[in-house]
Amino acid sequence: MAKAKFERVKPHVNIGTIGHVDHGKTTLTAAITTVLAKKGLAQQKRYDEIDNAPEERERGITINTAHVEYETEKRHYAHVDCPGHADYVKNMITGAAQMDGAILVVSAADGPMPQTREHILLARQVGVPYIVVFLNKADMVDDPELMELVEMEVRDLLSTYEFPGDEVPVVAGSALKALECGCGKEDCPWCGKILELMDKVDEYIPTPQRDVDKPFLMPVEDVFTITGRGTVATGRVERGRITIGEEVEIVGLMDAPRKTVVTGLEMFRKVLDEAVAGDNIGALLRGVDRKEIERGQVLAKPGTIKPHRKFFAEVYVLTKEEGGRHTPFFNGYRPQFYFRTTDVTGVIHLPEGVEMVMPGDNVKIHIELITPIAIEEGLRFAIREGGRTVGAGVVTAIEE
């Protein structure tokens, strides 16, 4: 039998479940697949199949993540669920699972808890743009006033971290009851709530802009000269598209971007008219000397990205067991920061009131690089010391 072809008919969206430990994130994930399976839109996944998440490595960090896929009538979803709190922190900071939106699971019986707050803060810091709330364990709350109180608390908490708390959709239900019932009917008091939640996710979380529609950017991996023709920069197109004759800027490792024109494009030794996101290409650049471009710079659509030296970032510091440092670091710590294709040395400034950072911590820091790099909010990087990864980070704000 021939392999099933992936039919790209529905728009694709990446989401995940976030929230405090034991509030029912994994149960909800299992319930979603169970209810949608009844409509022929998903493969049912049991709780233990999701809970025993496989290990993955991202930027030298081991993370346990479960990936589940399912569809609604309108969309195709890739859904991530992590077993442990540390896995969420690592996942969100490394961008191992980029989320276009998240389902925040809060137990109606307990209300918001410390990790509820922490996950909302992380979502804000790393740029998860939309949150939909599922108040779980509603079967354990008899008092409607108590339900209202918990909902208000969650909305206030979201507003505190600059999410639109008043507008965020909130659905109350019981993931466990829906999982146990599994009828998948809309008029079922439990399964119906799961379907209502997915309707809200469909409506409220917008379809993201595709990489190919974003402005062109290609990290330079290698540079060589073709005698008689000029300098070629190679790399994988990260986003956007580029055609022969277009102007681009070389950005990074120098104070001001430098303009040039792409006079030729090649992929796998074949000539191209146009390259798009995901293509591994060589770009022939007009009037650029071999010494004027190097690995660590980027080619970009003019005016879309600038070189910067100072910025704020949310970082996760690896534990000793993860191959990280054995000791804390202090203000003025000078590791290397690995952006896209290269290491750059920089100085870390800790926030006021933070004396030191321990292995296993996540913290917001200020970084000053010794040389400018093409940086924008949301850019992921690794922190390295003598060639080994000791942490991971994401740019949250640019200073200069």
Swiss-Prot record:
Keywords: Cytoplasm, Elongation factor, GTP-binding, Hydrolase, Magnesium, Metal-binding, Nucleotide-binding, Protein biosynthesis
Region span, G1: 19-26
Domain tr-type G: 10-209
Segments of this protein annotated with the region G3: 81-84
Amino-acid positions noted as binding Mg(2+) in the UniProt annotation, renumbered to this chain: T26
Stretches the record annotates as G4: 136-139
Chain positions recorded as GTP binding sites: 19-26, 81-85, 136-139
Subcellular location: Cytoplasm
Superkingdom of this protein's organism: Bacteria
NCBIfam families: EF-Tu, PRK00049.1, PRK12735.1, PRK12736.1, small_GTP
Oligomeric and partner information: Monomer.
Protein name: Elongation factor Tu 2
